[in-house]
Structure formats: C-alpha cells, structure tokens
UniProtKB/Swiss-Prot annotation:
One of its GO terms (cellular component) is extracellular space. PROSITE patterns: PANCREATIC_HORMONE_1, PANCREATIC_HORMONE_2. The modification Tyrosine amide is found at Y36. It comes from the Eukaryota. This is Pancreatic polypeptide. It is found in: Secreted. Hormone secreted by pancreatic cells that acts as a regulator of pancreatic and gastrointestinal functions probably by signaling through the G protein-coupled receptor NPY4R2. Belongs to the NPY family.
C-alpha cells in the first residue's frame, strides 16, 4: 500500500505545500481506486 505523505510543517514553503497536496491527492486516489 502507498505510504501516506508526511505533512511538511507549518513553516513549509509554498512549493513544499503544493508538493504535499499533490502527493496527498495521489495517495487518496490510490486508496479509493476500486479493486476489480
């Protein structure tokens, strides 16, 4: 199973936050993908 992305912290740069958001979206997509 994919690992949950680590939150970069409250003083993360916007780039880090964007990266985290993208990884989180991909992670959630993997979790919710139906398994046929």
């Amino acid at each position: 199973a994919p690992l949950e992305p680590v939150y970069p912290g409250d003083n993360a740069t916007p780039e880090q936050m964007a990266q985290y958001a993208a990884e989180m979206r991909r992670y959630i997509n993997m979790l919710t993908r139906p398994r046929y």
